[in-house]
């Protein structure tokens, strides 16, 4: 009997999927099984569109199509929680399995607390994540550092602190992530600061960290994180679609060491990005960025991209706003940003969506991440975990 907190090395029983998927195709097999058995109505994942740098959400209803979404896409920066609420009605009337990075999973949990996502209808298959990369700079990085045509890259992966790319002719090149980031490339800045790499708030947490011995590179390390995850894995095992074996104890230790090293690296980047990390109060953080806020065009891009912003009638709109929000001014009053902060910052998961779409290049993710960290210190609230309600959240009727 599989239980919460159990760990396994897993690989697909289907040789074709094991070859097409990464690390034994365990995730692909689980998603296909869930669809084929009617446990879910659809699978929400990501797929490449024009190329590896153009990553889009994909809703899969045919089990045979699941393999199309197999493999890593580190240039995929979108947050799938936004897709669930905006286009799938929060899974209110359909059952879905969603592949989630840690920030996706944490956002889903926050939206479940607000009853914007039906937790009973969602299975979260978590994927370990050490960070994603901005696609435009990614193409530039391929030309300048790897000296290859960006369009010739057919595969990329992050392993042992290096970004490894493979081109059409089978050539592999690798460069340490640290070297790329020292030059302003590599992972997104919000990903560098992120201290959550294993999505234990999902139902299953899957990745290649800790798989050693004969199955190294041929199996997925799966940690069971919820009773729902245990039930899914048990059913897949009983159906014979997935092979499980106990992980090597040394592998468990290695996995924890990798996670610990990534957390330390995130702490370093937080120290680099945030002045006086331990000492500043919340409002002094906002004061620090007034010059940045002066570049705001009031385009509402941050609101539209933020997966935590979901109100149908937004108080930031001129006809809905309170008296202290000035109307028709560009840039808007700092109260514009303060009002938005009060609505979402305790649940900010540092997914970086706001910063990516800002035409004024305001470092929004950096600002809100720092404020969120201050709120954690003040209230002890950890976003994206458990079922505790956010400390200052309010949920207007009808929103």
UniProtKB/Swiss-Prot annotation:
Activity as a function of temperature: Optimum temperature is 55 degrees Celsius.
Cofactor field: [4Fe-4S] cluster; FAD; Zn(2+)
InterPro entries membership: 4Fe4S_Fe-S-bd, 4Fe4S_Fe_S_CS, Co_F420_Hydgase/DH_bsu_N, FRHB/FDHB/HCAR-like, FrhB_FdhB_C, Helical_ferredxn
Enzyme Commission code(s) on record: 1.17.98.3
Free-text comment on the cofactor: Binds 2 [4Fe-4S] clusters.
Subunit structure as annotated in this protein's UniProt entry: Dimer of an alpha (FdhA) and a beta (FdhB) subunit.
Protein name as it appears in the record: F420-dependent formate dehydrogenase subunit beta
Organism: Methanobacterium formicicum
Lineage of source species: Archaea, Methanobacteriati, Methanobacteriota, Methanomada group, Methanobacteria
């Amino acid at each position: 009997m599989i239980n919460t907190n159990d760990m396994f090395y897993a690989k697909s029983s289907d040789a074709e999927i094991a070859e097409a998927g990464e690390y034994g195709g365990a995730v692909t097999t689980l998603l296909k099984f869930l669809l084929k058995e009617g446990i879910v109505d659809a699978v929400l994942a990501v797929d490449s569109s024009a190329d590896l740098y153009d990553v889009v959400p994909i809703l899969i209803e045919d089990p045979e199509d699941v393999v199309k979404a197999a493999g890593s896409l580190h240039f995929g920066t979108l947050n799938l929680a936004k897709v669930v609420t905006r286009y799938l009605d929060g899974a209110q009337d359909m059952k879905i399995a969603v592949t989630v990075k840690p920030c996706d999973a944490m956002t889903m949990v926050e939206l479940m607390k607000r009853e914007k996502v039906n937790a009973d209808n969602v299975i979260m298959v978590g994927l370990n994540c050490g960070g994603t990369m901005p696609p435009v700079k990614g193409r530039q990085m391929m030309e300048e550092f790897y000296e290859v045509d960006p369009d010739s890259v057919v595969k990329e992966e992050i392993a042992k602190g290096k970004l490894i790319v493979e081109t059409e002719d089978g050539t592999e090149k690798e460069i340490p992530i640290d070297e790329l980031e020292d030059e302003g490339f590599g992972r997104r800045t919000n990903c560098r600061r992120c201290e959550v790499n294993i999505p234990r708030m999902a139902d299953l947490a899957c990745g290649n960290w800790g798989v050693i011995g004969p199955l190294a590179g041929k199996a997925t390390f799966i940690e069971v994180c919820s009773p729902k995850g245990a039930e899914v894995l048990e059913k897949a095992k009983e159906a014979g679609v997935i092979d499980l074996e106990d992980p090597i104890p040394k592998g468990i230790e290695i996995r924890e060491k990798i996670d610990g090293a990534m957390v330390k690296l995130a702490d370093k980047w937080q120290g680099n990005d945030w002045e006086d990390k331990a000492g500043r109060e919340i409002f002094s953080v906002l004061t620090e960025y007034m010059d940045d806020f002066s570049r705001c065009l009031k385009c509402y891009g941050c609101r539209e991209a933020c997966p935590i912003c979901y109100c149908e009638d937004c108080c930031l709109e001129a006809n809905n706003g309170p008296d202290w929000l000035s109307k028709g001014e560009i840039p808007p009053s700092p109260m514009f940003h303060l009002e938005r902060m009060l609505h979402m910052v305790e649940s900010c998961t540092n997914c970086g969506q706001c910063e990516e779409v800002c035409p004024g290049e305001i470092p929004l993710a950096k600002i809100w991440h720092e404020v969120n960290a201050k709120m954690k210190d003040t209230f002890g609230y950890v976003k994206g975990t458990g079922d505790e309600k956010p400390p200052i959240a309010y949920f207007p009727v009808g929103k």
